[in-house]
A protein has these predicted regions:
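N-terminal Sec-pathway targeting helices
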Residues: 2-15
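Hydrophobic alpha-helical membrane-insertion segments, chiefly the h-region
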Residues: 15-26
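Buried hydrophobic residues that stabilize the cores of well-folded domains
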Residues: 26-234
């Protein structure tokens, strides 16, 4: 009888110990909102106002919490984004703000982006809090060529004086597209538009995609199109 009681006590002890151990390591399904909310946890509101005098429109995108209060989305880096579009529906300016309406620096880099369009070309400028063109790490402006479908083909980098500058070891990039319209190849370019090794050690980055366009593989080539390695271990 004593042995049976002893075995029962041991069994109960092990069961309780196991239960406590499971509870101790069980992941907390609750979210720590002390650091803020992600965009997926917030309501997204979109409002568009027409400006008949300027033949343009302003679309305001706002993140709201359950109390319908404007709220910072920690994964986006802003609470409010405003987009200015021209009569053709092309975005010509984008700015970012906090919940109080103050300009914010996106990615600790820039406060807004300005787009200027020409025939098969777009000029992209990065803006400071006052709406002036500002320099990033190396460049302040991208001159982008577009194909007939409006897709980005070539990007070239320039400073505030519109002088060509290097970024990641190149002066620009060229994009190729497959039959489905997916970008399947990026070539890094020197000042003369020829392939050059980027700072990662390759000149061409090829993408393998599935039917839905998801990247399933990457390949690195040198300036002659021969396989090579990435210096960053990709």
């Amino acid at each position: 009888m004593k042995n049976g009681t002893k075995r029962n006590c041991i069994f109960i002890f092990l069961a309780v110990f196991t239960l406590i151990s499971i509870i101790a390591v069980w992941p907390d399904s609750g979210k720590d909102h002390d650091v803020g909310f992600t965009s997926a946890e917030l309501k997204f509101e979109e409002k568009t106002e027409k400006d008949s005098t300027a033949d343009s429109s302003i679309t305001t995108y706002t993140f709201l919490n359950e109390a319908e209060e404007t709220t910072w989305a920690i994964d986006r880096g802003y609470a409010v984004m405003k987009q200015l579009k021209n009569a053709e529906g092309q975005e010509i300016e984008e700015r970012y703000f906090d919940a109080d309406g103050n300009p914010v620096k996106l990615y600790d880099s820039y406060y807004g982006v300005e787009y200027e369009y020409h025939d098969h070309e777009a000029i992209i400028r990065y803006l400071d809090s006052e709406g002036n063109t500002m320099p990033l790490a190396t460049y302040s402006t991208i001159v982008r060529t577009l194909d007939d479908a409006g897709r980005a083909v070539d990007d070239y980098y320039y400073n505030l004086d519109m002088q060509p500058v290097q970024w990641t070891g190149c002066y620009g990039i060229h994009r190729d597209y497959d039959g489905n319209g997916w970008n399947n190849r990026i070539t890094y370019l020197d000042r003369n538009g020829q392939p050059v090794l980027c700072s990662s050690g390759y000149a061409i980055n090829e993408y393998k995609r599935d039917e839905e366009g998801n990247v399933t593989g990457e390949f690195y080539l040198d300036t002659q199109g021969n396989p090579t390695k990435s210096s960053v271990g990709e």
